[in-house]
Amino acid sequence: NEELEEYNAKLDEDQQYDSNDMVGKLGLEQSYEDQLRGVDGSQKMYVDNMGKVLEIIEKTDSVAGNDIYLTLDSDLQKYCYNALEKELSYILLANLKNVTTSKEKEDIPITDVYSAFFDNNIIDIKALNAANATDNEKNVYNTFVSSKQYTLNALSDILKSSHTELYNLSDQYKDYMEFICETLSSNGIYDSSAVDKDSDTYNNYVNDKISLYEYLKYCISQGVIDITGIQTSSDYYDTDEIYNVIVDYVLKEFEDDSDFDKRVFKYMILSGEITGSQVIYLLYDQGILNSTTDEDYEEFTSGVLSNFEFIYRKIKKLEITPAMLALDPCSGSIVVVDPATGTVRAMVSYPSYDNNKLTNVIDPDYYAKITEDKTTPMYNRATMQRTAPGSTYKMLIAAAGLQEGVIDVGSVITDYGTFSKVVPSPACWLRSGHGTLGLADA
């Protein structure tokens, strides 16, 4: 196959892999494959017509590959991972607000947390309709089915009858219009890169002045819509007929589209069709939290803890983690280097995954789970992501300031959270600032 050919492309014939070889595909196993790989053994033998071995006439023993030794400190590695997760949770809690929506970019409304459980597949939507579903799950599912059908009917009316301009649509249905374009694009029907970005129609659309109906008909006339991938009854259509084919296709796609379903849940939560209490009970219904061992369960069910207080406490305890929510921030990395030797003592990417489930025999359910995870745990941020240095940069600035005499060990500054002397103005994650700090504390 193609993968085997790729592995063997630069190898001599006697060193090439065959389909039975085990190959490192991720992490260290992949990076050091040429070191870890051993040499296959072989046997030549005589067998009878039943396959029974009669005599081994030649044998070559296999040879193990080389060992590799890491400089990583296992305990430090675990400590850094846990510390990073805890720090991310503190930032989430600092920005978490008991509101439905917020205009402040850094705020995280509690409704975003409820939606995140669906959006990042923590709550299994399909399980809501299982034979053993709880009453709460069934109630949520029935509400969802009704709301989804209402939404599909409304979209059909907007696209086929009213042709409502975007400025006359609610934010919810503007979002659905954008999602329709995304779906058409990802399915190879709409080529957004081929649209004339200087055209009046395009600019009117992005500025909410016209309807999606008018914009798609323009795209059809410009040849940036391709319906050859859609099964149709004819090879020849005019513009109106192509538009109707697209609309029918989209509405049919949305009947069984998990991303569309997640959007429906998002707006059900925002409108109050599904309450925060129902979402929290779903966490217990589906085994994400355990009502038997959970010390907060009784306080929640008795009303001592509000929905917001319950979620806040669970995030603080890391029973609900940043990785589960996939809200900003939900990821990070730590690299610890020994300054005396330059050896790497810890290299952590959060969130991570269990690569033992992806070696030799791949666990398909687990692989599907992590590839669909919004936090992209298979992306190693410690080695692959370029990010601002953050607080690490403070040591460099402090050393430079001391060396140049701009500050001394007794200098203090007042941190207001945002550095407004330049535009754009960089801001700390804690927008209110850290107050007055000395050199050691900063």
What is each residue range found by the language model?
Residues N1-D365:
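Periplasmic/cell-envelope proteins involved in peptidoglycan metabolism and beta-lactam response
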Residues D21, D61, Y69, T376, ...:
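Preference for short coil/turn "hinge" residues that link or interrupt alpha-helices
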Residues N66-L72, A326-G332, D365-Y393, G410-I413, ...:
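Short active-site loop at a secondary-structure junction
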Residues I108-P109, K369-T371, P426-W429:
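Short alpha-helix boundary/capping motifs
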Residues V337-E372, T376-R381, R386, Q403-G405, ...:
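Glycine- and small hydrophobic-enriched segments that form the cores of compact globular domains
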Residues L358-V361, T387-L439:
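Short, glycine/proline-biased beta-turn/loop segments that scaffold the active-site neighborhood
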